């Protein structure tokens, strides 16, 4: 009963925050080419654009090794996916996100029986809303009198775009990737910021409170820095921190994306950590595709 009241109050708070942020936004960052969240794990502050349907799909190989008791190794593969659809004045986006993993957990002692595991590590249905865009109704005009002013650092770029996101998590009973008491529906809340700097640099932060109302509430932060070298290639570096009673880690990612067409991107990334309880090494490959029926009338 107490748990149900806690979940209800948390959900009401999230709804209140979203409705308090109903600011009219007429400018957003729809782009002529696809702007995927892959291959990083953070999400952009901006919607994909009104009436734009975007698919993001990746596969990865996972290797984990724990060198202290109970010693074990994990090897397997996984799939992560996301679907985004933009509606209402470019500011609101609906999305579905998830990660499915299949692996074998082998214990070196021989006393504990090896495990074959398969389930969703997470599955979420939610929405994202652009609360503040520093470039709203602003046209960045070149300085006709100063070459250095056009090429130099713009202090206004330090003010980030801000979004809030929320959603429902769905966890099944006896899921090996969650605490044993976690099942059913819980909530997610995310604060997102994004700075677009000159020279093709973008800095994104995500601060997430996940599985709110369950026995495993996760605190998660992700910091992502991307750089476009040319219209085709983008590189990124990312750090992700995870903290809960069930699992804690600090992950690092490096990767690249290649624009194969205006609506199609390929990507790859390497993920690792610096501890041995367990050590983590993942390599991923992915693709992003959008159906662009962008409508500026909404």
Features from the language model and the residues they span:
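Transmembrane beta-barrel domains of Gram-negative outer membranes and organellar outer membranes
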Residues: 29-212, 216-298
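Bacterial Sec-dependent N-terminal signal peptides
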Residues: 1-34
